[in-house]
């Protein structure tokens, strides 16, 4: 150990103090597992486990493509690698990380005597202090680590409980007192239920001897992660331990650390002055018309050289505006293919506010992959959430009761390390976000759940009457305006079939009789709008031509004869303003809307017209209508009811008076006269 005054009796190796209770409390305070900020837990990264020396320099590493916190390989650095640039008693204080094994080889290696060798490794080994600077010393170190009466032990440093204050710091290799060791290869076999790793030899003694004779690193360790270590997500900052040899005298030691680093697969670096606006492409200029080829003179006998045809260039990628327009065009094509009757007259509008997409749960057959597919490594800057998911489809994982209504079939992920890839045209909508593939390891380790969904843009379907009504002065609707989304009309198209329940909304697609006249004029209005846009395009084209002419004219400043037009030999050298045509077309459109407004008002009854005269008239009528009706009923039926009530009261009073009078008189008995 660190202090030479400590006794070396085997009985002192066992610490009677029990630290289990504070250690368990410490473990219970560890934070919950989390993936990279703003990413899906199923996303695949290039993960690297690094083993560092005492100066926190990487001396050994292993990499692989896996989701975070699912890959726990066995780390096999050599013991002497941990001593690179380490304490002087290891003999490698001047060796940089990743250096080859230093020192002369043994004279009795596997290839026989070697030039410049030092000592024969077959000679009896002495009890010299084991070092790593020669093959002989590394062979001695191998004997120490495999001997039953010697060995090595490991003490935790950065993550140990606060109660273990007597274990010291890096200067004592975190093993200042007995009882601090949690793992290692010594006869008392230290262990711990809370430490993150276990450390053992990775080679047998016979295997290590032969490797040492060949002048190689021959003391590899086997570092394995414990269950407690697999629950920790602070590996990116690193954890550190101390390792000491159990030999006679003072125990030599060193410190090492383990940390994790990860990065996205394939760098995606924007190029340009503004990475945010790199994809905001401008509208492409119209391709110039090819100039007609001039035929050579008939009398010319010189052979003409045929220039090779230019290689066709690929069209530039679509900008943001083009992508939005493609969404609407794709929605129309899909709707026209499946329901052509609904595309005769309609308006498809791309929703400008969130949510921009919605999902339809579907049933499908996913595929299993033992290695991570390419689409599993696609990085996402944010976790995408579907705020609206409808239908019933395939679910996987631990689905809560609040979301079981979305599940037609619920499956459990089997054990093993593999990936579940969604079918083409679908994605997994998980409680952690959207992802094209799932990691079975993540599903088995967590309580996540996912639903197989189709992703549809929020494109709303409107009948023509709804759009024209927005231009009318009256915004009063007898019923809520129709607003069917593309997901309701085409849900389940990818997996075969239309979403259930669409038939219940077909009656809403039928316009009222008052708007039938508006439907017939849709095509005419669209033609007028098209003409306006065409005229505007001509104006912009004419303006651009003038700008180009002016630029070319600047190159001909020294040509002073005839002016700019004569020098350029242009037939047209003025700006043709067609904005007046645009104003005329828009005026015609407004006139037609006004005519339809009058036609709509003429088709209404006199009573319906009251409610369109002013916005407060409807509120006034609905407020006083109730009291007026009650007052009218009182005036009509009040006198009759009052007379009947008075007559009833009089009858009751007369009966009471008769009863009172009868009780004031007594009936006289008749007298009997006797005959005389």
From Swiss-Prot:
Coiled-coil stretches noted in the UniProt entry, renumbered to this chain: 513-547
Motif (YXXL motif): 665-668
Bias-annotated ranges (Pro residues): 309-318
PTM remark: Specific enzymatic cleavages in vivo yield mature proteins. Envelope glycoproteins are synthesized as an inactive precursor that is N-glycosylated and processed likely by host cell furin or by a furin-like protease in the Golgi to yield the mature SU and TM proteins. The cleavage site between SU and TM requires the minimal sequence [KR]-X-[KR]-R. The R-peptide is released from the C-terminus of the cytoplasmic tail of the TM protein upon particle formation as a result of proteolytic cleavage by the viral protease. Cleavage of this peptide is required for TM to become fusogenic.
Keyword tRNA-binding: no
Region (Fusion peptide): 482-502
Keyword Transmembrane helix applies: yes
Renumbered residue ranges of the record's region Immunosuppression: 548-564
MF-aspect GO terms: metal ion binding
Lipid-anchored residues (S-palmitoyl cysteine): 640
Positions of the UniProt region annotated as Disordered: 287-321
Any one biological process term the GO annotation gives: symbiont entry into host cell
Pfam families: TLV_coat
Compositionally skewed regions (Low complexity) per UniProt: 296-308
Segment forming the signal sequence: 1-34
Site (Cleavage): 479-480, 659-660
Sequence positions that bind Zn(2+): 89, 120
Motif (CXXC): 346-349
Domain notes from UniProt: The YXXL motif is involved in determining the exact site of viral release at the surface of infected mononuclear cells and promotes endocytosis. The 17 amino acids long immunosuppressive region is present in many retroviral envelope proteins. Synthetic peptides derived from this relatively conserved sequence inhibit immune function in vitro and in vivo.
Protein name: Envelope glycoprotein
Organism in which the protein naturally occurs: Friend murine leukemia virus (isolate FB29)
